[in-house]
Amino acid sequence: MQKLAELYRGKAKTVYTTEDPDLLILSFRNDTSALDGQRIEQFDRKGMVNNKFNHFIMSKLEAAGIPTQMERLLSDTDALVKKLEMVPVECVIRNRAAGSLVKRLGIEEGMPLNPPLFDLFLKNDAMHDPMVNESYCRTFGWVSDEHLAQMKALSYRANEVLSQLFDDAGLILVDFKLEFGLYKGQVVLGDEFSPDGSRLWDKTTLAKMDKDRFRQNLGGLIEAYEEVALRLGVPLD
């Protein structure tokens, strides 16, 4: 499958059309961003790690009955995926307090959240991805009630699967974001799941093993990503 035209260039991936109108190529770059894209750096191997990590996770979710856009890996940095009509709202599941939740509510980082929280954010970098709710989605027509209910159910199901997967690897799945779209009328998980869009802590030391290492200038970003992949059994080489 060959890349044709560049359809979209995001902060860390480029999307290309193919000769099949129903399929796209996701190309993972070495770019790493923070502050809604205001700070960008490149890290060797990052595109490869995230591409293979994403394929591994999507395969696990598919096996658990969660429909994803993943078709197959094409190369170290490219994957073939279904073309989705993306929903402009992203879902966040929080198992422990971290990030914006800590700032917003003034609670302690790491506080367990039971049951896990489900948040919605409008995908808009210029507006810093404002938090919204189901009422906003209905009023502004971003997504139907039926599809949003499916997105919520699939997010919680993904949390069950992935929390156990990471726990078995000695990691805590603190929180993560998911993006969904429609494929021939069906709600399907799209975009990616990687340490770029999730928080992962070592279960024993609580060391951060995700993009917070870049956001907080902790160093060792790729080493942490590769360690997570190694523990999960993601084939990198």
From Swiss-Prot:
Could you tell me what reaction this enzyme catalyses?
Answer: 5-amino-1-(5-phospho-D-ribosyl)imidazole-4-carboxylate + L-aspartate + ATP = (2S)-2-[5-amino-1-(5-phospho-beta-D-ribosyl)imidazole-4-carboxamido]succinate + ADP + phosphate + 2 H(+)
- Tell me yes or no: is Ligase among this UniProt entry's keywords: yes
| InterPro entries associated with the record | SAICAR_synt/ADE2_N (IPR028923), SAICAR_synt_PurC (IPR033934), SAICAR_synth (IPR001636), SAICAR_synthetase (IPR050089), SAICAR_synthetase_CS (IPR018236)
Q: What is its EC number?
A: 6.3.2.6
Which Gene3D superfamilies did the record assign? ATP-grasp fold, B domain, Phosphorylase Kinase, domain 1
Enzyme class of the recorded protein, top EC level: ligase
Query: What keyword terms does UniProt attach to this protein?
Result: ATP-binding, Ligase, Nucleotide-binding, Purine biosynthesis
Q: Name one GO molecular function term.
A: phosphoribosylaminoimidazolesuccinocarboxamide synthase activity
Q: Which Pfam families match?
A: SAICAR_synt
Pathway assigned in UniProt: Purine metabolism; IMP biosynthesis via de novo pathway; 5-amino-1-(5-phospho-D-ribosyl)imidazole-4-carboxamide from 5-amino-1-(5-phospho-D-ribosyl)imidazole-4-carboxylate: step 1/2
Return the GO cellular component terms, semicolon-separated. Answer: cytosol
**What PROSITE patterns has UniProt attached to this entry?**
SAICAR_SYNTHETASE_1, SAICAR_SYNTHETASE_2
Glycoprotein as a keyword of this entry, yes or no, is no
Q: Which Gene Ontology BP annotations are present? A: 'de novo' IMP biosynthetic process; cobalamin biosynthetic process
> What's the superkingdom here?
Bacteria
Q: Give the protein family.
A: Belongs to the SAICAR synthetase family.
Q: Mind telling me what this protein is named?
A: Phosphoribosylaminoimidazole-succinocarboxamide synthase
Q: What is the lineage of its organism?
A: Bacteria, Pseudomonadati, Pseudomonadota, Gammaproteobacteria, Enterobacterales
Q: Which gene encodes it?
A: purC
